[in-house]
Amino acid sequence: MRSFDCGCEFEEDRNGIVFDCDITKLPLDRNATWDLICEGNTKGVFQLESQLGRSLAKQAKPRNISELSDLIAIMRPGCLEAIVKGKSLTMHYIDRKKHVDHVEYFHESLRPILESTYGILVYQEQAILIATEIAGFDLQEADILRKAIGKKKTDVMAKVKKSFLEKAESKGIVTKEEAEEIFSWIEKSQRYSFNKSHSVAYALLSYQTAY
């Protein structure tokens, strides 16, 4: 935020105009800002100034806050280090977004939960919704899962897995093998995935600093 403050001051001094620094009033549909992000010209931009951030911005080409939120989330180890069919979930997301790969869902019941992220598990909230849908987790159980993911509690995750598999088998939406595969995605997200509210807040700051 300090770099954003300095940018505003510089603009005012250079052009002799008063720049409205109220970041809450910046339009979120400014093409020049999105072009800058999509071109990877993001040095000094919150969350996107690293080489990885610039590279993924050029590949994912976000054009709104929701897509920018996804980009920030798939930069985390949960997606970067989860390898499925020879490539990371990060690259699966990007390739599906760019129509290089077809969007597919491991099970049709996951479509409403994962449709916004091209069938890829990106956010903690999605993991919780999957546990609710597939295994019938109640709010307390879902909150335990959230803490296990957010705080990387391996011992807690092992207990949650046992409960998930038992409840999923009892509910009968998916087979035991399918439940094990689905939970393996959730386990991978334990390596560090974002909750969506956090990621959206970061996306807003990224856009504002790019602006």
Question: Model segments located where?
Answer:
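Mg2+-dependent phosphoryl-transfer active-site scaffold
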Residues: 1-194, 201-210
